[in-house]
Regions:
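Catalytic cores of alpha/beta
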Residues: 70-85, 113-126, 157-188
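Hydrophobic faces of well-ordered beta-strands that scaffold small-molecule active sites
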Residues: 10-16, 40-42, 70-72, 87-89, ...
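Glycine-rich, proline-tolerant flexible connector loops at the mouths of alpha/beta enzymes
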Residues: 41-51, 133-140
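Alpha-helix-loop-beta-strand connector modules within alpha/beta enzyme cores
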Residues: 52-72, 91-94, 98-114, 144-169
Length: 199
């Protein structure tokens, strides 16, 4: 049973994937917010921008009720229209955004998969990085994880916060291993979408 993850030195971000839920998605988001992660990244890659914007409004409202930061994914123009100044983007999108557009955000997170990408994202103004995938995960079946050595190398090469992603669980031993590598936190996808019992 999980009560809270917000009292950890190691920061936990929830990343959504509504296809993993066993109950209505918004109900699951509320359950996630009840354990107070550092933030919720609304990552629903199959939606159109219009569909995403409609869902984002509802998720932002739930996050606001629980005072949990909501980070919108990919559709940065929609984020601005909704008054959300925290976004998580693929590196190719960050490369196309102007400096003036970047200034409209208080937080820009970037997904990276190599040390070179990490350095590039930092140079372009990323506030934090997610580096992965670190552990084996069903989301990346057949792909070998990059592992803790990769995470440690990324953390050594940049001066911005790094979160591990990929196969991250509610496992303090795992969290400790990532923290020793220099990561500030980890992103949990499957575990967050399947929380069913709270203390």
């Amino acid at each position: 049973m999980i009560k809270s993850v917000n009292n950890q030195n190691f920061k936990i971000i929830a990343v959504s994937n509504r296809k993993l839920c066993n109950r209505p998605f918004l109900e699951q988001i509320e359950r996630v917010c009840k354990i107070h992660p550092e933030a919720v990244i609304l990552r629903e890659k199959d939606l159109t921008e219009e569909e995403y914007g409609t869902l984002a409004k509802e998720v932002m409202n739930i996050c606001s009720r629980y005072q949990v930061s909501c980070i919108l994914h990919n559709f940065w123009k929609t984020a601005l229209e909704l008054g959300c100044t925290s976004v998580h983007l693929p590196l190719p999108i960050l490369q196309k955004i102007t400096d003036e557009e970047k200034k409209k955000f208080t937080k820009i997170g970037i997904s990276i998969h190599s040390v070179e990408e990490a350095k590039e994202a930092e140079r372009l103004g990323a506030y934090y990085l997610t580096a992965g995938h670190i552990y084996a995960t069903d989301c990346k079946k057949g792909l070998l994880p990059r592992g803790l050595e990769f995470l440690e190398e990324v953390c050594k090469e940049v001066n911005i916060p790094v979160y591990g992603i990929g196969g991250i669980k509610f496992d303090e031993e795992q969290w400790n291993d990532m923290e020793k590598c220099g990561a500030i936190g980890g992103c949990i996808v499957s575990g967050m979408m399947k929380i069913y019992q709270l203390k």
